[in-house]
């Protein structure tokens, strides 16, 4: 019976943990920038801990910007694009209390089970700079839990960048 309770606690913890971690995508922009005058862009830099992810981030952003009608050029574009990707470790503690609390006689079965879950969070930040004024005109960021499978993480990256650029260029 104790093993059943232990497995149930783990199943509940896993269900809550999975539901709690979803993509967090945010965007912000310079409200004075005239996005109608921007048509070309070039890559200034892409920095990630893993060199394989540099081209993946670049490809995802290229796809999103080109879908909006922007054209990539080698240099001297209207906008310079920079991106940074990072991974950090996260730990979550969840405690479940078994048994029933007592009113008068102290209850019974008071056991607590604490589970620790370690996971990694991946974050990507994309910045767009006006090349004339050298000022930041748009920023998008996304964070999500990472899988142990690179193809799943690449799919998450593509979805995150699509969400970032969903309402791009911003309306005034």
Task: Set out the residue ranges of the language-model regions.
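Positively charged n-region of N-terminal signal peptides that target proteins for export
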Residues: 1-6
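Bacterial N-terminal signal peptides
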Residues: 7-19
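A structural "domain/chain start" motif
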Residues: 21-68, 76-79, 83-85, 89-92, ...
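C-terminal/domain-edge helix-coil "capping" segments
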Residues: 22-33, 116-123, 130-138, 143-172
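A short, structured loop/turn motif at beta-sheet edges
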Residues: 37-39, 72-77, 128-135
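Short helix-to-loop capping/linker segments positioned immediately adjacent to catalytic or ligand/cofactor-binding
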Residues: 67-72, 149
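Surface-exposed short loop/turn segments
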Residues: 68, 83-135, 143
